[in-house]
């Protein structure tokens, strides 16, 4: 499958394996990847990843590991053992944590992509101030994205508004995975920094994470095809 055809990652906003599989029944694994987050993975464990892989979907395991270097690296390698396409950590865990993860993945000859979360898309300046960072979100994103690149990871999660800045700052050989994507007319839900799929791709995003607009659609396949057409 060409990477360019798999720019959409469908977030499986489901509590059970049954519900997740019902969603993917209506999706085409040649047109998208899927994301398994904390709620679904905590309910169902590794079996849901295996079931999705049996349906030929590549899985982004979105667990945002954040711990001491050795513990985080062990968790990342455990995810890689599941054969997931991508896994992530929190960049705020620091350089040593991220470098240790990269070293362990290389030592194990894993092909799993490793990216980092910079600033959660639900956080604005006041939220950062509450945790002792008197800084605009975009400045913290830039700082953590540079650290992620220097640590040898494959990319970062960032909002579309930051994608253009990061592309200029870091260069082309770096994935920018963008949540907070909503097609025209969609509800913003709990994402503060949102943008349309077309604009996100124009701004430099390589992968778009889209959940409820697809999974809650009357016809998820048609919604996915509509989004793909909008960014073609």
From Swiss-Prot:
Catalyzes the decarboxylation of orotidine 5'-monophosphate (OMP) to uridine 5'-monophosphate (UMP). One of its GO terms (cellular component) is cytosol. Belongs to the OMP decarboxylase family. Type 1 subfamily. HAMAP family: OMPdecase_type1_B. GO terms for molecular function: orotidine-5'-phosphate decarboxylase activity. Disulfide bonds: none annotated. Keywords: Decarboxylase, Lyase, Pyrimidine biosynthesis. Pathway: Pyrimidine metabolism; UMP biosynthesis via de novo pathway; UMP from orotate: step 2/2. It catalyses: orotidine 5'-phosphate + H(+) = UMP + CO2. PANTHER family: OROTIDINE 5'-PHOSPHATE DECARBOXYLASE (PTHR32119:SF2). GO terms for biological process: 'de novo' pyrimidine nucleobase biosynthetic process; 'de novo' UMP biosynthetic process. The active site is at 64 (proton donor). This is Orotidine 5'-phosphate decarboxylase. Its EC number is 4.1.1.23. It comes from Acinetobacter baumannii (strain AB0057). Substrate binds at residues 13, 35, 62-71, 121, 182, 191, 211-212. Homodimer. It is an enzyme of class 4 (lyase). InterPro entries: Aldolase_TIM, OMPdecase, OMPdecase_AS, OMPdecase_bac, OMPdeCOase_dom, RibuloseP-bd_barrel.
């Amino acid at each position: 499958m060409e990477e360019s055809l798999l720019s959409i990652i469908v977030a499986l906003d489901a509590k059970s394996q049954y519900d997740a599989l019902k969603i993917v029944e209506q999706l085409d694994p040649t047109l998208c990847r899927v994301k398994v987050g904390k709620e679904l993975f905590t309910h169902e464990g590794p079996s849901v990843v295996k079931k999705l892989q049996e349906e030929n979907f590549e899985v982004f395991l979105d667990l945002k590991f954040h711990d001491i270097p050795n513990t985080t690296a062990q968790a990342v390698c455990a995810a890689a053992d599941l054969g997931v396409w991508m896994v992530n950590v929190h960049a705020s865990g620091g350089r040593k944590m991220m470098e240790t993860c990269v070293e362990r993945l290389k030592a194990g000859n894993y092909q799993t992509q490793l990216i980092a979360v910079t600033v959660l898309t639900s956080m604005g300046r006041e939220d950062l101030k509450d945790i002792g960072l008197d800084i605009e979100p975009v400045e913290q994103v830039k700082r953590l994205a540079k650290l992620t690149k220097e640590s040898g990871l494959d990319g970062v999660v960032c909002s579309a508004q930051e994608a253009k800045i990061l592309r200029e700052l870091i260069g082309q050989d770096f994935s920018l995975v963008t949540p907070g994507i909503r097609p025209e007319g969609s509800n913003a839900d709990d994402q503060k920094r949102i943008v349309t799929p077309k604009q996100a791709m124009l701004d430099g995003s390589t992968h778009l994470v889209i959940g409820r607009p697809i999974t809650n659609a009357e016809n998820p396949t048609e919604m996915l095809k509509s989004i793909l057409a909008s960014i073609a």
